[in-house]
């Protein structure tokens, strides 16, 4: 075979594989990690239940088991490829992220992360993990929770990051991607008693996304992904009315698209279970531009899923069926994963 033919074959191989890589789905996921604490005492915080001498007797052995459980689930969810973006909540600090993404087989996927220490009284915050194989970080910041009717109450920040594609010159990655990670106020004090605080978080998120849309150049529709544990179902007022996030079958002018708005083809009953009822608190919501398949990265139709590997579940002997294999239930240690299942969608680029 002469040199010209060899070079031609090599060029064809490179072009073919580049196009294929650009059109492989990019998985975007979210997971509530449930109390992902390190085992060390933090003298700057008043909450130290998750330490060796604390109420939960959180030892190094238990921490490493939790970490290893999480990396196995993430590898399974990503099908052993790098996730494009993984939003997380209930993350204590940089140490647990470094341990998870630099000291396990996840290290091969070239992840980086974003975490800001926030006002949560337990010291747990949202985080964004992203693959340098897929995205470059442009900027990040947090938007604090603020309720003018109850200024004494503090809740978790909303984490924001702006990305461009790792290969910004390619058609598949030409667009900017805006990502918001949420962990709205819990129902711990009662659903009705706390509905206003979640509506407040929804209003903050809506205002921030609207500001991105308004500031965009004429004729350009920003691609925004909102994800998180909203502590409300898709039809609850905070999500449906305040954020105005609707299932694609219920869209109205000015609405965002809740890809988890109905349990229609999501692959599982819900993301968390209360007695006999599965609910979808963990959701991924997008602006209409993410659904536009004419240019750049866009939603792969039908890809929204609740990830539920068998090893993340166990038999529910009280309420029947399956339940989540958790790390703790109250003070009792079980050595499992989380009290939430992760969710994901796939984005795909245009063929050239």
Give each language-model segment a name.
Residues 4-15:
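Sec-dependent N-terminal signal peptides
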Residues 19-110, 114-124, 312, 316-321, ...:
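N-terminal, active-site-proximal structural segment of metallo-dependent hydrolase catalytic domains
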Residues 33, 91-176, 180, 184:
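Structured beta-strand-rich core segments of catalytic domains in phosphoester-bond hydrolases
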Residues 35-42, 170-172, 188-189, 293-295:
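Short, solvent-exposed loop/turn elements at domain surfaces
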Residues 44-47, 175-197:
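Active-site His/acidic residue clusters
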Residues 54-61, 82-88, 115-116, 147-149, ...:
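Second-shell loop/turn segments in exported
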Residues 153, 210-224, 232-352:
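Metal-dependent phosphoester-hydrolase catalytic domains
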């Amino acid at each position: 075979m002469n040199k010209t033919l060899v070079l031609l074959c090599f060029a064809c191989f490179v072009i073919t594989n580049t196009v294929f890589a650009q059109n492989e789905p990019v998985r975007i996921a979210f997971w509530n990690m449930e109390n992902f604490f390190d085992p060390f005492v933090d003298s700057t915080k008043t909450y130290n239940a998750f330490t060796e001498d604390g109420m939960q007797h959180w030892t190094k052995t238990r921490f490493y088991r939790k970490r290893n459980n999480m990396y196995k689930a993430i590898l399974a969810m990503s099908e052993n490829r790098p996730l494009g973006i993984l939003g997380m909540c209930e993350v204590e600090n940089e140490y647990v992220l470094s341990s998870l993404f630099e000291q396990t087989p996840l290290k091969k996927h070239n992840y980086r992360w974003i975490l800001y220490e926030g006002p949560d009284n337990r010291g747990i915050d949202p985080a964004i993990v992203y693959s340098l194989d897929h995205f470059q970080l442009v900027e990040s910041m947090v938007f604090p929770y603020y309720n003018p009717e109850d200024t004494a109450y503090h809740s978790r920040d909303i984490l924001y990051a702006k990305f461009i594609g790792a290969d910004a010159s390619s058609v598949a990655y030409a667009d900017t991607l805006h990502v918001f990670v949420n962990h709205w106020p819990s129902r711990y004090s009662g659903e009705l008693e706390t509905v206003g605080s979640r509506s407040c978080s929804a209003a903050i998120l809506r205002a921030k996304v609207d500001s991105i849309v308004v500031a965009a150049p004429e004729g350009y529709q920003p691609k925004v992904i909102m994800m998180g544990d909203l502590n409300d179902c898709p039809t609850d007022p905070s999500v449906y009315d305040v954020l105005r996030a609707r299932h694609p079958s219920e869209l109205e002018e000015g609405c965002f698209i809740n890809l988890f708005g109905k349990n229609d083809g999501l692959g599982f009953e819900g993301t968390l279970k209360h007695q006999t009822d599965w609910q979808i608190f963990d959701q991924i919501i997008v602006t209409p531009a993410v659904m536009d398949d004419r240019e750049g990265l866009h939603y792969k139709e039908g890809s929204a899923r609740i990830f539920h590997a068998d090893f993340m579940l166990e038999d529910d002997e009280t309420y029947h069926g399956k339940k989540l294999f958790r790390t703790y239930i109250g003070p009792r240690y079980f050595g499992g994963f989380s009290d939430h299942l992760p969710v994901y969608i796939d984005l795909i680029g245009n063929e050239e």
